[in-house]
């Protein structure tokens, strides 16, 4: 693994590159909320061993890019612009793929209205359509008008503890993985599981609503191949039901 700088419209982003000797394709990976690019090292080395050139970076407010304000993404538009600029840095002569996990899947679904990759792998994506989720979204948006930068433990617990309650067991953050070792490592990792700002929750919620609009889906390339994946117990994707809904669109 090597590192390179990609100069975006916002800043110079430190991008990790996994480069095989004879790459057959290129892939950009977009990670999820309250985690960082390093969690995907094993997966990207696996792809590298199978001759796929991979790049990954930390979203704004995450990992190496917390800028002293970890958990604050700024805006979802910034996340999508960064993803577009890093995507454009992929080798031009290779088929291009993008994989987005959880919050990264929302970034990807917005990004797909502006790019035409060979393939898109959408992992654990979600919607917010239940009456309770609509109430929670309205509540968060209201609080964001007054305290956008606050990292409310109550709201963070409302979001993530609610996910935990849908999964058997007692470990904190058990909703993130069926593999107990993954959960333990996540909880030990100082760059994972951190609170995010109310503004970040608002931005994510609004983006989830936006990705289902015809303005976005109507601009997807008909030549892009899709692979939709979800854990059957994943609470963010409503136990995989949101993947089925997306497949039907």
Feature names for model-found ranges:
Residues 108-191:
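Alpha/beta-hydrolase-fold enzymes
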Residues 32-35, 102, 232-233:
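Active-site glycine-rich loops that stabilize anionic/oxyanionic intermediates
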Residues 228-230:
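Short beta-strand/loop motif that positions the catalytic acidic residue
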Residues 99-104, 108:
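Gly/Ala-rich beta-loop-alpha elbow adjacent to hydrolase catalytic centers
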Residues 1-19:
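N-terminal cap/lid segment of alpha/beta-hydrolase-fold proteins
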Residues 37-68:
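Conserved alpha/beta-hydrolase
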Residues 24-32:
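Short beta-strand element of the alpha/beta-hydrolase
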Residues 73-91:
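Alpha/beta-hydrolase active-site loop
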